[in-house]
Amino acid sequence: MFRQSIRPLVSNRLTFIRYNSSPAYTAAVSLLKGDLKKAMIAKDEMKKTAIRSMLSAIKNKEIALKGKSADEYSLYDMYSKLISQRKDSINEFLANKRDDLVAKEQGEMDIIKKYMDQLPVSSELDIDQNVKKLLDALKTKAGEKKVQIKEIMGEIDWKSLPTEWKTSPTAIKNSIVKQFKEIFK
């Protein structure tokens, strides 16, 4: 009897966390779960492993957020992190001459990229173009004065800019750091 009274409380809390998320986030997670079922039926081990690792990372992120809303931008950051982990692993495996593991990691990375491309988020090229325009505008505004990167970060409206550009703040920051050296030489 005690078990029955606890059970509904736990399931309601989990649905509340998902209810608090954006529709694109919920759609992406349900797509992953559906594709996991299809991969299990088709016995596609590589796809199954990649999707399970993605769902595991998503679940860990939801636990870390502690009830705060999650959106497609946090998913984009998570997928980017998973891809960079795969790239690091590939480099290590190449150094150790483990071609079998390189092929496995490359396959998983391709699967993650496929899901990353399906998110309603701006591509890296679009982000870089927007950042270049922003940095050019800030450079003309500053004139001949020496500009530091922390001043640029302070000028940006971090509440509205990510939603305008349809990307995560982390992706914007990475692009700013990457392009700052080229523009402010």
Swiss-Prot record:
Keyword Transit peptide: yes
Entry keywords, A to Z: Mitochondrion, Transit peptide
Subcellular location: Mitochondrion
Gene Ontology cellular-component annotations: mitochondrion
FT transit peptide: 1-20
UniProt GO MF annotations: carbon-nitrogen ligase activity, with glutamine as amido-N-donor
Keyword Transcription in annotation: no
UniProt cross-references to InterPro entries, sorted A to Z: Asn/Gln_tRNA_amidoTrase-B-like (IPR003789), YqeY/Aim41 (IPR019004), YqeY/Aim41_N (IPR042184)
PANTHER family xrefs: ALTERED INHERITANCE OF MITOCHONDRIA PROTEIN 41, MITOCHONDRIAL (PTHR28055:SF1)
Family: Belongs to the AIM41 family.
Record's protein name: Altered inheritance of mitochondria protein 41, mitochondrial
Organism, scientific name: Saccharomyces cerevisiae (strain YJM789) (Baker's yeast)
